[in-house]
């Protein structure tokens, strides 16, 4: 029975995916994923990225956010991306493949950033979901904590941070930590985010050293 249920659920997901307006639109516009529209919507509201900025994109693969970021940052900007999964090259994006949870990967990423401060940290990281909330939520919260730690290491004064967070245990405490580090924090649920998803995006501006 469980196998049949999984098969039916998978079929529903596939149908939803291929019928998805944003998936079709992503294909039409040459975006690598529907996630590109999430950062576009956030950018439209919050104007995080401007020409000449340095941006770090965590959880970048397959590259939807990096595509948007590199276009906004322009020729004089810099985009440094990282993901545990491989990502096809994007012109203007310096990509590091590795597990961000590992110290050696963080060190390699910091080396690529160099001495200059970063203007924007983006994180669309998420763990592989098991379907068990008691397992998935702590894993997801650990990743967003690491992303906030990255901000503390590289972000310039008044810098910005946009991070995907799953609502659940630890969310309110995390929100408090972000509010302590930034002047303004807003919660965004982009139209391109599936309604049934628990994901929201915290958009923080005005980093306080």
Curated annotation (Swiss-Prot):
It comes from the Bacteria. The active site is at 164 (proton acceptor). The keyword Transferase applies. Pfam families: FtsJ. GO terms for cellular component: cytoplasm. It is found in: Cytoplasm. Its EC number is 2.1.1.166. Gene3D superfamilies: Vaccinia Virus protein VP39. The keyword Cell cycle does not apply. GO terms for molecular function: rRNA (uridine-2'-O-)-methyltransferase activity. Keywords: Cytoplasm, Methyltransferase, rRNA processing, S-adenosyl-L-methionine, Transferase. Disulfide bonds: none annotated. InterPro entries: RNA_methyltr_RlmE, RNA_MeTrfase_FtsJ_dom, rRNA-MeTfrase_E, SAM-dependent_MTases_sf. It catalyses: uridine(2552) in 23S rRNA + S-adenosyl-L-methionine = 2'-O-methyluridine(2552) in 23S rRNA + S-adenosyl-L-homocysteine + H(+). S-adenosyl-L-methionine binds at residues 63, 65, 83, 99, 124. SUPFAM superfamilies: S-adenosyl-L-methionine-dependent methyltransferases. Belongs to the class I-like SAM-binding methyltransferase superfamily. RNA methyltransferase RlmE family. Specifically methylates the uridine in position 2552 of 23S rRNA at the 2'-O position of the ribose in the fully assembled 50S ribosomal subunit. This is Ribosomal RNA large subunit methyltransferase E. The gene is rlmE.
